[in-house]
Amino acid sequence: MDFLMSGVAACGACVFTNPLEVVKTRMQLQGELQAPGTYQRHYRNVFHAFFTIGKVDGLAALQKGLGPALLYQFLMNGIRLGTYGLAESRGYLHTNEGTHSPVRSAAAGALAGVMGAYLGSPIYMVKTHLQAQAASEIAVGHQYKHQGMFQALTEIGQKHGLVGLWRGAVGGLPRVVIGSSTQLCTFSSIKDLLSQWEIFPPQSWKVALAAAMVSGVAIVVAMTPFDVASTRLYNQPTDTRGKGLMYRGILDALLQTARTEGFFGMYKGIGASYFRLGPHTILSLFFWDQLRSFYNTYAK
């Protein structure tokens, strides 16, 4: 039941935040491996990107990739949050005093994140391809021209096999390890602190909401460079064998980005990342916490 509730919670958040994921993806691909000031900026900021995409591609384009995004969230976060919740409910993450151990929470979050992300990697790759697709006048990054999720998965599988479907999976793991461990560690620790300080009534939904807000800030700062690199790894063009033509791996992507675009190139789209990850983290963790509380109350 933990896995089902976790997947449902993540999907609920995804419906609201997917347009921000589209904006974030395009801002991260804009000016790829080009020095600042040498390329046309189709998307100047989050709000301009929303306006531009809606105007040129149509309002429906703001929900591009929603199908694979929902499937990925259900698979990835169902496994990630479900596994973490199982470990938490059995007391593996607590100290002798009954509070969450930051080290154990971070380790459990990282391990759970790796399992979920690796399984869902082909879906995430196709989601990235679909969200990057745009009209030629505002296109950024490589354009794959997929017709949909199933067509894309079938085409990639036929051309490059399982290796092609899981291309970029290993390179995407540092993003998830850092993001998941930061998110779940800060969420659990802040919940403990708020409960100890008795700022809100015991078992109040405000505790989960406040902890999720803090967790959202932490995850964006820690994860954005790896998120930029991961997006580019998944979206890069490939040769006939399915091998990437621009980056050899996550470290190469980070180094090339920093060398060509500067330090802030690794933080491209951080505003969009927070507008997306902030609400997504808040909503998914809040829904997850409330569903678990409801289930535990009902089960008893």
From Swiss-Prot:
Principal location listed in the UniProt entry: mitochondrion
Coiled coil segments of this chain: none
Main function: Putative antiporter that exchanges dicarboxylates and sulfur oxoanions across the inner membrane of mitochondria.
Solcar repeat ranges, renumbered to this chain: 1-90, 100-193, 203-294
Keywords annotated in UniProt: Membrane, Mitochondrion, Mitochondrion inner membrane, Repeat, Transmembrane, Transmembrane helix, Transport
Gene3D superfamilies reported in the protein's UniProt record: Mitochondrial carrier domain
Origin organism lineage: Eukaryota, Metazoa, Chordata, Craniata, Vertebrata
Disulfide bond entries: none
Membrane-spanning ranges: 38-58, 59-79, 91-119, 169-190, 205-225, 277-300
Keyword ATP-binding set for record: no
Compartment annotation: Mitochondrion inner membrane
Membrane topology: Multi-pass membrane protein
Protein name (Swiss-Prot/TrEMBL): Solute carrier family 25 member 35
GO cellular component: mitochondrial inner membrane; mitochondrion
Similarity comment: family membership: Belongs to the mitochondrial carrier (TC 2.A.29) family.
Catalytic activity: a dicarboxylate(in) + sulfate(out) = a dicarboxylate(out) + sulfate(in)
SUPFAM superfamilies (UniProt xref): Mitochondrial carrier
UniProt entry tagged with the keyword Transport: yes
Domain of life of the organism encoding this protein: Eukaryota
Species, as recorded: Mus musculus
